[in-house]
Amino acid sequence: MTDLIRVDAHAHLYRTPEEGYAEKTGYEVWEYGDQADVHQTECVGTVDELLLQMRSAGVSKAIIVNLFSAAVSRKVAVEALPEGLTEYEKEKRTADIDAWIRSEIVSFNKWNCDLSQQHRELVAFVAADVNALPGPLCAEHITDMVENYAATGVKLHGAYQDFDMSDERLWPTYQACEELNVPIIAHSGPDRKSRGFAEPRAFAKMLDSFPQLRVVIAHLGGGSWIQTLDIANAYPNTFFDCCEIVAWTQSENGPTEQELAQLIRDIGSSRVMMGSDFPWYDLDYSIDRVFSLPILSMEEKERIIGANAVDILGL
């Protein structure tokens, strides 16, 4: 029966339309280069929008991955400080900003968990950010979210959050996830400063150190997809979603449909899940894109659409 299930393994939600609109318009998908015809949706990431799309597309579960960046939040808040502050005033305001950021990530994650209790078709993956919760605080927060708020997994985005995926500040968080047996879904792809923080090869040291950790490398490596197969072959505890990248098969830096399908086949289609990256893309569009891929059998595509996520994420 699980073969017939449809699961969106990568979606985002926001507490208000304004919050979703700001996040969506402020986050540019640039890494694939130019493409003449890019799919767009008018949605801004509200709960009602997603539930409507799930019903329309026949999706029974959606993984809600919280996207939060202390680095971005801090930069925006510091830039908004009034001019003419004394050094003491600036330090005080900055300390207040950091305290607000810590409370904000906790609040956002609790909201996601509460949402999953109200709507059982939504599955909460909470944000981890060592720039918001330094030292052991991040691991302690994740443990609290899993044990007391029913979080099912963790979301990371090194390029956006401004840390390398193998930054050892993350080690306590990875250890907590490994001990709790909860998976991580992590953005992968290049960053604008070419630091390689979230490229597939940036995961190697982390994967060496935590061989029992289930890690989903999102977007099949995105604009760095050429690196993905080597990581998949080296680390059997890695899994993947094809969200976003499946919309960019006519771009300068993305794979062609043939190359994308071959990559999925070479990795092993049972290790790959469908995700929409809602509200950047629609659910039915993302499903149709998977079904349009060459090479793969109908059975493989149907499992990518749903059953693989059940197995990989333990739904």
Enumerate the language-model features and the residues they cover.
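Mid-to-C-terminal alpha-helical segments outside catalytic/metal-binding sites
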Residues: T2-A9, E18-K61, Q262, G268-M273, ...
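Conserved, mostly hydrophobic/aromatic
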Residues: H10, M54, N112, V154, ...
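Histidine-centered divalent metal-coordination motifs
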Residues: H10-T16, H187, H219
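Active-site gating loops and adjacent loop-to-helix segments of metal-dependent hydrolytic enzymes
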Residues: P17-V44, A77-A99, Y149, P236-C242, ...
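Divalent metal-dependent hydrolysis catalytic cores, especially in the metallo-beta-lactamase
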Residues: W30-V76, Y88-D96, E121-D129, T152-G153
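Acidic-and-aromatic substrate-binding clefts and catalytic sites of carbohydrate-active enzymes
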Residues: H39-G45, A70-S73, I101-E104, V130-L137, ...
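Active-site gating/metal-coordination segments in enzymes
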Residues: K75-A186, D191-R192
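Catalytic pocket-lining loop regions of alpha/beta-barrel enzymes
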Residues: Y149-G153, Y160-M273
